[in-house]
């Protein structure tokens, strides 16, 4: 019986792991599980799609589902959260938030590529409408929807790292007024020395 390889996380690392697993094992069942409803896409391109430099958010998607399912024989399970792993029985617990459905999936090999999460702050008002984190395509769509609803378009960005600075540029291209706040004295504090950061600023 072919072994089952389960990959948790459908970003670049997870997709790469699934495709390499296919190259090394032509007979295994490979299941790639992602919590978003889309296959792998370029997260770093999100601000550029938002600004219009890249034609659309969909242009960031690397491969369509047939490339996974038919070309590489990788089964996609999109829109599922991994809520538990039992290493003793080699089983993962999955939940689909949109309808609450739960499943268990046995594995012979498990690869974890869950990636990062957007940094958030637990400040009063951080849960109000109009407050966003930027990490996913859905985040960008919600921000675009919000900006289309309001007449005066002003955005405050907390953080002047790479994502915050790219979003500031994207918003300015879209004629949105931007205020960017950063705890460090200069922008891109973990990437550039102060002299270079001052030039970029």
Predicted regions and their residues:
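FAD-binding core/adjacent interface of flavoenzyme oxidoreductases
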Residues: 1-8, 61-62, 66-154
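Beta1-alpha1 glycine-rich phosphate/pyrophosphate-binding loop at the start
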Residues: 2-75, 168-195
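Glycine-rich Rossmann-fold phosphate-binding loop(s) that bind the pyrophosphate
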Residues: 9-13, 135-136, 159-161
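Residue-level preference for nonpolar/small residues embedded in alpha-helices
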Residues: 60-61, 103, 163, 196
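Short acidic/polar capping segments at secondary-structure boundaries
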Residues: 137-139, 161-163, 185-186
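Hydrophobic residues in beta-strands of the RecA-like P-loop NTPase core, especially within AAA+ ATPase
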Residues: 157-158, 181
């Amino acid at each position: 019986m072919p072994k089952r390889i389960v990959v948790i996380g459908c970003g670049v690392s997870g997709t790469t792991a699934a495709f390499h697993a296919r190259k090394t094992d032509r007979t295994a069942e490979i299941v790639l599980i992602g919590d978003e409803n889309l296959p792998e896409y370029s997260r770093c391109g999100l601000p550029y799609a938002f600004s219009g430099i890249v034609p659309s958010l969909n242009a960031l998607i690397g491969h369509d589902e047939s490339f996974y399912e038919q070309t590489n024989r990788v089964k996609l399970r999109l829109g599922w959260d991994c809520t538990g792993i039992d290493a003793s029985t080699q089983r993962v617990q999955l939940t689909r938030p949109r309808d609450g459905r739960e499943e268990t999936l046995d594995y012979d090999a498990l690869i974890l590529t869950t990636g990062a999460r957007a940094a958030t702050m637990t400040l009063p008002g951080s849960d109000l409408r109009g407050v966003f984190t930027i990490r996913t395509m859905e985040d960008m769509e919600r921000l675009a929807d919000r900006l289309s609803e309001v007449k005066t378009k002003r955005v405050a960005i907390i953080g002047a790292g790479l994502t915050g600075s790219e979003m500031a540029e994207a918003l300015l291209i879209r004629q949105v007024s931007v205020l960017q706040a950063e705890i460090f004295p200069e922008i891109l504090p973990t990437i550039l020395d102060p002299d270079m950061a001052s030039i970029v600023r």
